[in-house]
């Protein structure tokens, strides 16, 4: 009887751990070095077809000013969407989730994300980390 309870408890614990691990499906899509001068063609290419429903941005090193961002989907018509990003991100700060409306059933793959912006208040280039959630 005791071994049955031990096995049951082990199975329940394993299921609980696997559901927690599955709930946090965030991946670092990449890091972009932000130049000191305003640049509008900073591109993060996604080499593998990846369905991304939303992203977060983190200023890893230095402060960042953003003037825009767009996401491009892997489709025959090269569809894109402008993203509503904050105008500034301080070093160490992470934005809230920014939704990507890929389509009704969220099946289109993201091929690249472009940013316009630059480093502020630093002589070094800031780093913009892009985190995706599928």
UniProtKB/Swiss-Prot annotation:
Q: Which UniProt keywords apply?
A: Signal
Q: Where is the signal peptide?
A: 1-23
User: One Pfam family of this protein, by short name?
Assistant: DUF2541
User: Would you say which domain of life the source belongs to?
Assistant: Bacteria
Give the UniProt family note: Belongs to the UPF0412 family.
What protein is this chain from?
Answer: UPF0412 protein YaaI
Organism the protein comes from: Salmonella newport (strain SL254)
């Amino acid at each position: 009887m005791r071994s049955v309870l031990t096995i049951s408890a082990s199975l329940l614990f394993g299921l609980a751990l696997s559901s927690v691990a599955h709930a946090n499906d965030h991946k670092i899509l990449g890091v972009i070095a932000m130049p000191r001068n305003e640049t509008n063609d900073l591109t993060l290419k996604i080499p593998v077809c990846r369905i991304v429903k939303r992203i977060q941005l983190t200023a890893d090193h230095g402060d960042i000013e953003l003037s825009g961002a767009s996401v491009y989907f892997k489709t025959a018509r090269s569809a894109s969407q402008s993203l509503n990003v904050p105008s500034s991100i301080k070093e160490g700060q992470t934005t809230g989730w920014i939704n990507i409306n890929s389509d009704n059933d969220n099946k289109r793959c993201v091929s690249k994300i472009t940013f316009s912006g630059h480093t502020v208040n630093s002589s070094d280039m800031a780093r913009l980390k892009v985190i995706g959630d599928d």
